[in-house]
From Swiss-Prot:
Signal peptide span: none
Protein name (Swiss-Prot/TrEMBL): Protein argonaute-2
Record note on domains: The Piwi domain may perform RNA cleavage by a mechanism similar to that of RNase H. However, while RNase H utilizes a triad of Asp-Asp-Glu (DDE) for metal ion coordination, this protein appears to utilize a triad of Asp-Asp-His (DDH).
Gene Ontology cellular component annotations, sorted alphabetically: cytoplasm; nucleus; P-body; RISC complex; RISC-loading complex
Catalytic activity: Endonucleolytic cleavage to 5'-phosphomonoester
Modification after translation, per record: Hydroxylated. 4-hydroxylation appears to enhance protein stability but is not required for miRNA-binding or endonuclease activity. Ubiquitinated on surface-exposed lysines by a SCF-like E3 ubiquitin-protein ligase complex containing ZSWIM8 during target-directed microRNA degradation (TDMD), a process that mediates degradation of microRNAs (miRNAs). Ubiquitination by the SCF-like E3 ubiquitin-protein ligase complex containing ZSWIM8 leads to its subsequent degradation, thereby exposing miRNAs for degradation. ZSWIM8 recognizes and binds AGO2 when it is engaged with a TDMD target.
Any one of the GO BP annotations: pre-miRNA processing
Domain PAZ, chain residue ranges per copy: 210-329
Positions that bind a divalent metal cation: 578, 650, 788
Function of the protein: Required for RNA-mediated gene silencing (RNAi) by the RNA-induced silencing complex (RISC). The 'minimal RISC' appears to include AGO2 bound to a short guide RNA such as a microRNA (miRNA) or short interfering RNA (siRNA). These guide RNAs direct RISC to complementary mRNAs that are targets for RISC-mediated gene silencing. The precise mechanism of gene silencing depends on the degree of complementarity between the miRNA or siRNA and its target. Binding of RISC to a perfectly complementary mRNA generally results in silencing due to endonucleolytic cleavage of the mRNA specifically by AGO2.
Xref: PANTHER family: EUKARYOTIC TRANSLATION INITIATION FACTOR 2C
């Protein structure tokens, strides 16, 4: 297909006051030499990278005299090998045999080497200085392999990061998991220079420990002695969910620590689990695992009442008693962390900006790339100081309120408040109900009465008067009572505007309230935690009002019209799009794509579209239909056809820019043409990324903001650490509260509207101030944030009462075999809800 090429950077931004920053990018000095690229083929294939690296290391040693001499080749763990001097093998394929001393017996591998190409670093210099149109990908890949070769041998690589268990101190998370600290490293092209991006990071790993201890952690036993009888069904299911897919090693064969992958946990204990055993006579008998271990390994099991692990391939019937297995070290946890684990993780890893800066500098000193023999072999030098870069702090927009005084708020450090201000368009609430799902003894009628009074007072002040007492206020229990109660409300009270639902902490009731309210009956619902009813604060009540007003069709505030950038001179629609994927380990659940579109000129109100699509599919499959719906809705709301479409796309990684742009830009165009054959609004396609490792720090201590010492809200960078030729920028639009702020990265993949840098940066920053759920600037533009909320809400709509709890299904991770149509129907929002911001 025809490749769309992202536009060149139009200019550099100049708006705002300048600020001196340091970025965690380290300049690389790269010689203008050629690098020699060889392809390796290792047989048997499918070895883990770690093993491949060992093979190559042995090969280089063993064939030093014949082939490698003093060269120090670097290897990517798969099939790419690079050298600084050509190998004396010409263009022919060379076949070698390499022996790895193994556990028990040696393993023999066949390796073939063949020359692929010369990678010119001169071409890279030309691209970075803008003399060549695009940066050659294979050069960056080669440099990346050089920089990673040594750390890959020393540490446990995960993606682009390296981890190692903390020396001396462990950071347990519970449930058999612990925190490992490490660092991210990637080679990035920037204007004039290659940069090494280095950041500290942390992730959850499984603790290397006996499986018996793992069981205790997962099932909350003080010790295994508490469990004298077989596991119950629910215990076994929970344990299976945690251990399935992990690697274990056996301890009962001396030095032969064979490793296996767990595919299941047996229903029967080791004393009863049988398998077909071939006897010497040739006939097979059924033998129990416990008996086999006694006869074969002279091992009397201590815990014959516990189940076995089924390992290897399902059909092979290999069973291991728990007590002879250990969890293999260095396995990253890809399953979702529990809430407790997540908060423990954040406590262990959140660092104020200055602390993080110091840690990164410390890391650079200990990594000491300039003494790395492989890096030196290729003549590369890395500066050990962070890169200085000049940023700009943009002016925040003024925020216009309504009511009598039409007050104007001016954000300071990304924050403003509603004191003495009224909603731009407040909704009068006449008919409303309360449904309390918290137990009456904990959340008493006195609590409810005082909560109602406080809420009404705050709502009056905010210009969204709740007139009169609720028409209905009853207690209820359990998710099953939601449907009948809501039906009764809808049928009994004409003109019912809102149901306030009080919840006792985490509960399946929430998912059911949203399923019934959003998709079945089309009723506006506002949930409140019991603790916020028992003791109210002006802050929580005010936040509730922000959400309620919007759900009922109100407008909380708008950008001051005369302060908006020129793009607003013609009708423009803002679209936000996101795809969310199910947590890892759920093979069957669908991905959810959401697209929202602005419905007024402020822009304040948004309309949502949502679809289920194939598991882990990154591209929005049904985008044309979704955009079409939004354009029609925009026309109905405003009586205008947008002349411009500004599309903020979240959740795309760099490797997918091309694919996503190609498919989705065409889809947006198709949506327009299908509405009217000559309808061709200008499209600007911007990818928003939060998941990257660029961190910015204030050079001047006096510029640091707040306890966490972060850069000020509005800090923008579009030089030195950004792309050499394309249109991208960093913008930190929010005030960092905890840890180190991540500036969001914006990459313009298409622009029919010919934005200047200033205009697009200011527009983006202003849109970060239009998020209705709080009176602060958020980290990404409101439309992108809303798309995320819509997809997140759809996850709740998919929760199946019969099978899942909202926290995750305890069936074997499938969407209970519901077919695509059923899932599609489940996320379809009710007609009456469609035009409201139900997701707020």
């Amino acid at each position: 297909g025809y490749a769309f090429k992202p536009p060149p950077r139009p200019d550099f931004g100049t708006s705002g006051r300048t600020i001196k920053l340091q970025a965690n990018f380290f300049e690389m000095d790269i010689p203008k030499i050629d690098i020699y690229h060889y392809e390796l083929d290792i047989k048997p294939e499918k070895c883990p990278r770690r093993v491949n690296r060992e093979i190559v290391e042995h090969m280089v040693q063993h064939f030093k005299a014949q082939i490698f001499g003093d060269r120090k080749p670097v290897f990517d763990g798969r099939k790419n090998l690079y050298t600084a001097m050509p190998l004396p093998i010409g263009r022919e394929k060379v076949e070698l045999e390499v022996t790895l001393p193994g556990e028990g017996k040696d393993r023999i591998f066949k390796v073939s080497i063949k020359w692929v190409s010369c990678v010119s670093l001169q071409a890279l210099h030309d691209a970075l200085s803008g003399r060549l149109p695009s940066v050659p990908f294979e050069t960056i890949q080669a440099l990346d392999v050089v920089m990673r070769h040594l750390p890959s041998m020393r540490y446990t690589p995960v993606g682009r990061s390296f981890f190692t268990a903390s020396e001396g101190c462990s950071n347990p998370l519970g449930g058999g998991r612990e925190v490992w600290f490490g660092f991210h490293q990637s080679v990035r092209p920037s204007l004039w220079k290659m940069m090494l991006n280095i950041d500290v990071s942390a992730t959850a790993f499984y603790k290397a420990q006996p499986v018996i201890e793992f069981v205790c952690e997962v099932l909350d036993f003080k010790s295994i002695e508490e469990q004298q009888k077989p596991l119950t069904d629910s215990q076994r299911v929970k344990f299976t969910k945690e251990i399935k897919g992990l690697k274990v090693e056996i301890t009962h064969c001396g030095q032969m620590k064979r490793k296996y992958r767990v595919c299941n946990v047996t229903r029967r204990p080791a004393s009863h689990q049988t398998f077909p055993l071939q006897q010497e006579s040739g006939q097979t008998v059924e033998c129990t695992v416990a008996q086999y271990f006694k006869d074969r390994h002279k091992l009397v099991l201590r815990y014959p009442h516990l189940p076995c692990l089924q390992v290897g391939q399902e059909q092979k019937h290999t069973y291991l008693p728990l007590e002879v297995c250990n969890i293999v070290a260095g396995q990253r946890c890809i399953k979702k962390l529990t809430d407790n684990q997540t908060s423990t993780m954040i406590r262990a890893t959140a660092r104020s900006a200055p602390d993080r800066q110091e840690e990164i500098s410390k890391l650079m000193r200990s990594a000491s790339f300039n003494t790395d023999p492989y890096v030196r072999e290729f003549g590369i030098m890395v500066k050990d100081e962070m890169t200085d870069v000049t940023g700009r702090v943009l002016q925040p927009p003024s925020i216009l309120y309504g009511g009598r005084n039409k007050a104007i708020a001016t954000p300071v450090q990304g924050v403003w408040d509603m004191r003495n201000k009224q909603f731009h368009t407040g909704i009068e609430i006449k008919v409303w109900a309360i449904a309390c799902f918290a137990p009456q003894r904990q959340c008493t009628e006195v609590h409810l009465k005082s909560f109602t009074e406080q809420l009404r007072k705050i709502s009056r002040d905010a210009g969204m008067p709740i007139q009169g007492q609720p028409c209905f206020c009853k207690y209820a229990q359990g998710a099953d009572s939601v449907g009948p109660m809501f039906r009764h409300l809808k049928n009994t009270y004409a003109g019912l505007q809102l149901v306030v639902v009080i919840l006792p902490g985490k509960t399946p009731v929430y998912a059911e309230v949203k399923r019934v309210g959003d998709t079945v009956l089309g009723m506006a619902t506002q949930c409140v935690q019991m603790k916020n009813v028992q003791r109210t604060t002006p802050q929580t009540l005010s936040n509730l009002c922000l959400k309620i007003n919007v759900k009922l069709g109100g407008v909380n505030n708008i950008l001051l019209p005369q302060g908006r950038p020129p793009v607003f001179q013609q009708p423009v629609i803002f679209l936000g799009a996101d795809v969310t994927h199910p947590p890892a380990g759920d093979g069957k659940k669908p991905s959810i794509a959401a697209v929202v579109g602005s419905m007024d000129a402020h822009p304040n109100r948004y309309c949502a579209t949502v679809r289920v699509q194939q598991h882990r599919q990154e591209i929005i499959q049904d985008l044309a239909a979704m955009v079409r719906e939004l354009l029609i809705q925009f026309y109905k709301s405003t009586r205008f056809k947008p002349t411009r479409i500004i599309f903020y796309r979240d959740g795309v990684s760099e490797g997918q820019f091309q694919q996503v742009l190609h498919h989705e830009l065409l889809a947006i165009r198709e949506a327009c043409i299908k509405l009217e054959k000559d309808y061709q609004p200008g499209i600007t396609f911007i990818v928003v990324q939060k998941r990257h490792h660029t961190r910015l720090f204030c050079t001047d201590k006096n510029e640091r903001v707040g306890k966490s010492g972060n850069i000020p809200a509005g800090t923008t960078v579009d030089t030195k650490i950004t792309h050499p030729t394309e249109f991208d920028f960093y913008l930190c639009s929010h005030a960092g509260i905890q840890g180190t702020s991540r500036p969001s990265h914006y990459h313009v993949l298409w622009d029919d509207n010919r934005f200047s840098s200033d205009e697009l940066q200011i527009l983006t920053y202003q849109l970060c101030h239009t998020y209705v759920r709080c009176t602060r600037s958020v980290s990404i533009p409101a439309p992108a944030y809303y798309a995320h909320l819509v997809a997140f809400r759809a996850r709740y709509h998919l929760v199946d009462k019969e099978h899942d709890s909202a926290e995750g299904s305890h069936t074997s991770g499938q969407s209970n075999g519901r077919d695509h149509q059923a899932l599609a129907k489940a996320v379809q929002v009710h007609q009456d809800t469609l035009r409201t911001m139900y997701f707020a």
